Amino acid sequence: MEKVTGIGGLFFRAEDPAKLASWYEQHLGVTQVPTDYDQSPWIQQTGPTVFAPFEQETDYFGDPSKQWMINFRVDDLDRMVAQLRRHGIEVSVDETHYPNGRFARLRDPEGNPIELWEAAK
């Protein structure tokens, strides 16, 4: 069976796409969409990606009106959280150390939920 080889993009609606793209670049290092074919898109590091549809009634994303949540892998959760907090971004750290790693939550300027994941080493 032929399979997909990975996620090639994440596309979503935004009230102010340019402003939101700048926020992701400034605070999380996700480069913006190239404006021509000579530029490279954001290249993520090799690692696991979880593809998980959730029940409609889930509270995992926080706000029930949000239909998606993105999870970003990070090398050092504590350093990333400190960096975000220095910029005035509210981050909630789950103090539980799970077998698969540690997690933190925040929201982008438009209220979209973001999860940060430091995989277990």
Annotate the PLM regions.
Residues S40-W42, W68, N100-A104:
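Short beta-strand micro-motifs in enzyme catalytic cores
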